[in-house]
């Protein structure tokens, strides 16, 4: 008997979204380059965030420190509709 896949095709898959981060930057009238400078992160990390790719938790913490916010203010887990 074959085991069923842990990720059945009918199940919803989840992914990280950084939309909240971009909305927060707009609210604070900051540009991505300003965030990179203030949080001391690279433009490559900003680009990864823009593509909703995984980044090191240290980067997320630096962003939160720079923006004086919580991790839940800059990211969320959403259903992957792709």
Show where each model-derived region lies.
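Short C-terminal boundary/hinge segments that cap the last helix of small helical domains
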Residues: 68-82
């Amino acid at each position: 008997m074959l085991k069923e896949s842990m990720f059945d095709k009918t199940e919803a898959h989840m992914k990280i979204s950084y939309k909240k981060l971009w909305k927060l930057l707009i609210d604070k009238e900051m540009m991505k380059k300003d965030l990179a400078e203030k949080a001391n992160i690279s433009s490559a990390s900003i680009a990864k965030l823009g593509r909703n790719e995984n980044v090191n938790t240290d980067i997320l913490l630096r962003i939160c420190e720079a923006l004086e916010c919580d991790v839940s203010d800059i990211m969320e887990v959403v259903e992957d509709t792709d």
